[in-house]
Every structure is written in C-alpha cells, then in structure tokens.
C-alpha cells in the first residue's frame, strides 16, 4: 500500500511560525514520525509540501495509479480553494483531511472547509498526532475498500 501525504502552504515554517498555536515540531519532525508509523504499518509513504496551489493540484492529479490514499493538510487553502476541492473530488481515492488545530474553535473564517464535503473524513485539533491518525484512517479506508466519502 502506498499513501501520499500532502502539506499545504506555510507548513514548511512549522517550528518557527506561531509556535503558541502550532507547536515546536517542524515539518521534518512530522514527516519522520509519519515514516516511522508507515514502516510499522507496512506502508510506502511519500510526503510532499508546497506553498503553491497549482503544485498541490498537480500532485493530486498524479495520485491515481501511484498511491492508494492521500492524507492532506490543505492549510490556508482549506477555506476557499474550490480548485483543490475539485481535484480531491476528481481523483477517486480516499482523502483524509487533517489540521493541526481545531479549525472550528478558531477565527470564524477558518470554520468552513470546502475540502471536507469531498474528503473521506476530517481530523483536526490533535496537533501533529492528527497526521498519524490520518495515516491510520487512510490505511483503514483502503483496507476496507472505501474509495471516498462514507
């Protein structure tokens, strides 16, 4: 089984940016923890980060036939990127949306995700552990043959 982890904009600044909100772990730390869990689960993992909406869309478009599921933190694009929403809907793979913080407990403009309605599920508010939960969820969805929304 192969899983793609997509990290959206500004996540490359984790560990330096708003540490009171996002914590001290870096993106490299998160990727290392994900790789460790993936090894335990027998999963081949690819991690990709971009600040570019177009690059994230291109990687999603390339996912079918190369991966079985996607764990995706769309970050700031969560709330308004119809293009990413449409890409998630188009790929025909289980996509688990993850967020470090509880987007529903933050500023009102962060409460709405345009990605969630086309994702298999959403995990938010558990910090970096949310990525690990997202990977476990993706593996479970693939194992059960779930392609998209329940």
Swiss-Prot record:
Residues that coordinate or bind substrate: 73, 79, 86, 100-101, 110
Pathway: Metabolic intermediate biosynthesis; chorismate biosynthesis; chorismate from D-erythrose 4-phosphate and phosphoenolpyruvate: step 3/7
General function of this protein: Catalyzes a trans-dehydration via an enolate intermediate.
Record note on quaternary structure: Homododecamer.
PROSITE patterns: DEHYDROQUINASE_II
CDD domains attached to this UniProt entry: DHQase_II (cd00466)
GO biological process, one term: chorismate biosynthetic process
Molecular function via GO: 3-dehydroquinate dehydratase activity
EC class: lyase
EC number: 4.2.1.10
Residues the record marks as active site: 22 (proton acceptor), 99 (proton donor)
Reaction(s) the record says it catalyses: 3-dehydroquinate = 3-dehydroshikimate + H2O
Family per record: Belongs to the type-II 3-dehydroquinase family.
Gene3D superfamilies, alphabetized: Dehydroquinase, class II (3.40.50.9100)
Lineage: Bacteria, Bacillati, Bacillota, Clostridia, Thermoanaerobacterales
Name of the protein described by the UniProt record: 3-dehydroquinate dehydratase
InterPro entries documented for this protein: DHquinase_II, DHquinase_II_CS, DHquinase_II_sf
Alphabetized UniProt keyword annotations: Amino-acid biosynthesis, Aromatic amino acid biosynthesis, Lyase
Organism: Desulforudis audaxviator (strain MP104C)
Site positions for Transition state stabilizer: 17
């Amino acid at each position: 089984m192969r899983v793609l982890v997509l990290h959206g904009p500004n996540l490359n600044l984790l560990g330096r940016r708003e540490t009171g909100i996002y914590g001290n772990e870096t993106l490299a730390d998160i990727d290392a923890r994900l790789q460790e869990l993936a090894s335990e689960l027998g999963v081949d993992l690819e991690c990709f980060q971009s600040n570019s909406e177009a690059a994230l869309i291109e990687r999603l478009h390339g996912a079918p036939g190369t991966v079985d599921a996607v764990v995706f933190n769309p970050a700031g694009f969560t709330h308004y990127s119809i293009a990413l929403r449409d890409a998630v809907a188009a790929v025909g793979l289980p996509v688990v949306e993850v967020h470090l913080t509880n987007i529903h407990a933050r500023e009102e403009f962060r409460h709405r995700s345009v990605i969630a309605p086309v994702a298999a599920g959403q995990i938010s508010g558990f910090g970096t552990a949310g990525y690990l939960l997202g990977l476990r969820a993706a593996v479970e969805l693939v194992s059960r043959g779930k392609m998209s929304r329940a």
